[in-house]
Design a protein with these regions (language model features):
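Conserved AdoMet
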Residues: 2-76
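Residue-level signal for inorganic ion chemistry
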Residues: 37, 67, 97, 123, ...
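Active-site beta-alpha loop architecture of Rossmann-like, nucleotide-cofactor-dependent enzymes
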Residues: 41, 164-167, 219
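Conserved SAM/SAH cofactor-binding pocket of Class I
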Residues: 68-171
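Helix-to-beta-strand junctions that scaffold the AdoMet/dcAdoMet cofactor pocket
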Residues: 132, 180, 206-208
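Mobile active-site "lid"/loop adjacent to the S-adenosyl-L-methionine
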Residues: 163-193
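Conserved Class I SAM-dependent methyltransferase catalytic core
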Residues: 189-253
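Flexible, glycine-/basic-rich loop-and-beta segments that form/coincide
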Residues: 254-258
């Protein structure tokens, strides 16, 4: 279906259809790429996350079902925030989390931020693909440096930052290690560098009583929560992914003024 440009229904309905020479060539190239270990999402150039069609390239991580945990946690909280909540998706990559939030929280104003201009180009394309341009903007920002003043203040910061440890990087499968962007994977020797940096640099970008929602790797939950608590956050909820692994945390900074 992907290579022919025809829907499954059309192909099944017309058994006299045949693949053109170009379609056969495209499929042959795709099979070779798959046999070389390249992920299917990159071969197709598209993937789905939280019911949204997304463009994906080797400049961004492939959205995974595990990440639905942080998206769902953020959405549940955002639905009960004040009108027109401002939400920052930091280290946004393809924009999958922020776009999922914008698609479900109809009055949310979402900023997709990443250091990589190539990733931001993909995020911007996905914003248009899902017709969310009226409430979503894409900006360049570095999670490891002070939050730029132009960002303003947010009700919530959500992030799936790089969290793979040094040891884990060496053990990643070929399809990840050799194809997905290292800068979106490696989180420092202990995998926690970006959590420390975001809490230090982006807490000032939160409104008083604002929320942070993080995805984290297996076994990192206690350490991520400790980093948050040591910096004035109260842990509100820890949640699991579809494989029953602890995957995300929601925390609140300070208390909202009366």
């Amino acid at each position: 279906c992907h290579f022919s440009g025809k829907s499954q229904e059309v192909i099944l309905a017309d058994r006299d259809l045949y693949a053109s020479e170009q379609v056969c060539l495209d499929m042959s190239r795709a099979v070779r790429r798959l046999l070389d270990g390249e992920p299917l999402a990159y071969v197709l150039g598209e993937w789905e996350f939280y019911g949204l069609p997304l463009r994906v390239t080797p400049d961004v991580l492939i959205p995974r079902d595990d990440t639905c945990a942080v998206a769902e946690l953020a959405i549940r909280k955002a639905l009960f925030l004040e009108q027109d909540p401002r939400i920052l998706d930091l280290c946004c990559g393809s924009g999958c989390i922020g776009l999922a939030i914008a698609s479900r929280v109809k009055d949310a104003k979402v900023t997709l931020a990443d250091l990589s201009m190539e990733a931001l180009a993909v995020a911007k394309e996905n914003t248009g693909l899902n017709r969310l341009g009226g409430r979503v903007r894409c900006v360049q920002a570095d999670a490891t440096k002070k939050a730029p003043a132009f960002l303003g203040k947010y009700d919530m910061i959500v992030s799936n930052p790089p969290y793979v440890t040094g040891a884990e990087m060496q053990a990643l499968p070929h399809s990840v290690k050799d194809f997905e962007p290292e800068m979106a994977l490696y989180g420092g020797e202990d995998g926690l560098d970006f959590y420390r940096a975001i809490v230090e640099n982006y807490t000032p970008a939160l409104k008083k009583g604002g929320f942070v929602c993080f995805e984290f790797g297996m076994g990192q939950g206690d350490d991520v929560c400790r980093i948050l608590e040591e910096n004035g956050y109260a842990i509100l909820e820890r949640t699991r992914d579809y494989n029953d692994r602890e995957r995300a945390v929601l925390a609140q900074y300070g208390r909202k003024e009366d």
